[in-house]
Design a protein with these regions (language model features):
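Sec-dependent signal peptide recognition
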Residues: 4-12
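N-terminal signal peptide c-region/cleavage motif recognized by signal peptidases
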Residues: 18-20
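Active-site-adjacent loops and short helices of periplasmic peptidoglycan-processing enzymes
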Residues: 22-176, 180-184
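Hydrophobic alpha-helical segments and their boundary regions
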Residues: 7-8, 28, 93, 136, ...
Length: 378
């Protein structure tokens, strides 16, 4: 039988801060702020709205490339050619973001990554697409394969660059999913995003993510801009052992983009405090055991649950836990017996397993017979 129980989590600790606490809003057309560790949504505005991602699309180009590197299909020292197509669409002649690679030159994958991350080079993106898949069209099918794999439900990619196409779109939430996947799946390559400049073909270019130079913990990821998308930006920050991922977009200028992102990151860092809600192995209830040496098993929290809590005064969350009863012995320590769900205003914040905190061996024939009779009559 499935049991479903609820209770309130009461916080008795009061948090005091010298800085004033504020509500938050943004002039950005869309925005999304996520706690990397728990997937808590700290702020959202039009997060599922269809948007044109511009150069933020290049995060998916990089994800595909990182996957090929991780699997050993290609290596950092491998070189891809800058075809005439890549040069005309994304090179110096194109009047678009470029790493200024020369036509028919060969560029190592390592330098192409820098050309994409730091210089937002369309020529570098097309060279990667052609080097991996033979053409941008075929590469786009690989990009869309990963949208499905990562759960990016509102995305469709038509090219590697983010140059405008009416059928090339995504959402703020999907791009945050992608950014988190890059950090989580390929930490060995994330350092590229924090490099502040790159020189290629004698031409120096600074990283377009100008928040890297500010003391707010930003260490990646990407900016974007087309006439149709406006100015956009997705970043990650790491301060006080807390990583946040944030996106803003649809803004009229680079300056507005930077200021709105700075406000959003500052809000995430100042308005929330990470608190221990449950300790690992904390027992919250018991469950009946059938056919065991003991009649009950403890339902214990499987891991420390730390959440970012709004310091503006909320003192409780709701928790719901589910389990089947009875459970059948033998039971091993660490076996999953149920799950706990923590909610804020009916929004699920986090789910975690409930486990047995000890071994329970199967009982003898008499103990099993007694249990069977008891459950038969109940």
């Amino acid at each position: 039988m499935l049991f479903n129980k609820s209770f309130k989590i009461i916080f008795c600790i009061l948090f005091f801060y010298s800085t004033p606490v504020f509500s938050f809003d943004t002039n950005s057309e869309y925005a999304f702020l996520l706690d990397y560790k728990t997937d808590q949504i700290l702020f959202e505005k039009n997060s599922n709205k269809k948007i044109f991602p511009a150069s933020m699309s290049k995060l998916m180009t990089l994800y595909v490339l990182f996957d090929y590197l991780d699997k050993g299909v290609v290596n950092m020292t491998d070189e891809f050619i800058i075809s005439e197509n890549a040069w005309r669409k994304g090179g110096a002649i194109s009047d678009s973001s470029t790493m200024f690679a020369e036509v028919s030159s060969y560029v190592s994958i390592e330098n192409l990554i820098r050309g994409i991350v730091i210089q937002s080079g369309n020529d570098a993106c097309i060279a990667v697409a052609e080097g991996i898949s033979g053409s941008e069209d075929l590469f786009a099918t690989e990009m869309n394969f990963f949208t499905q794999k990562l759960g990016m439900k509102d995305s469709n990619f038509k090219n590697s660059t983010g140059l405008h196409h009416n059928e090339h779109y995504t959402s703020a939430k999907d791009l945050v999913i992608l950014a988190k996947a890059i950090i989580k799946d390929f930490p060995q390559y994330y350092h590229f995003f924090s490099e502040e400049s790159f020189t290629w073909n004698g031409i120096f270019q600074p990283n377009r993510n100008n928040l890297l130079k500010e003391n707010i913990g930003v260490d990646g990821l990407k900016t974007g801009k087309t006439d149709q998308s406006g100015f956009s930006m997705i970043v990650s920050s790491f301060v006080n052992q807390t990583r946040l991922i944030a996106i803003v977009g649809g803004l009229p200028s680079k300056e507005k983009r930077t200021s709105e992102m700075r406000k959003l990151i500052n809000y995430g860092q100042k308005a929330f405090k990470r608190s221990l809600v449950f300790k690992a192995n904390q027992v919250i209830d018991t469950v009946d055991v059938w056919g065991g040496e003991e009649s009950f098993a403890s339902l214990a929290i499987s891991e420390d649950i730390n959440l970012l809590l709004d310091i503006r005064g909320r003192r409780f969350l709701n928790a719901r836990y589910l389990y089947n009863s009875p459970v059948t012995a033998p039971i091993k320590k660490g076996d999953t017996l149920g799950k706990i769900i923590i909610l804020n205003d009916d929004q699920i914040i986090i789910e975690s397993n409930l486990i047995s905190n000890k071994d329970i061996d199967g009982g003898n024939f008499i103990e099993k017979a007694v249990d069977a009779m008891g459950y038969l009559f109940n």
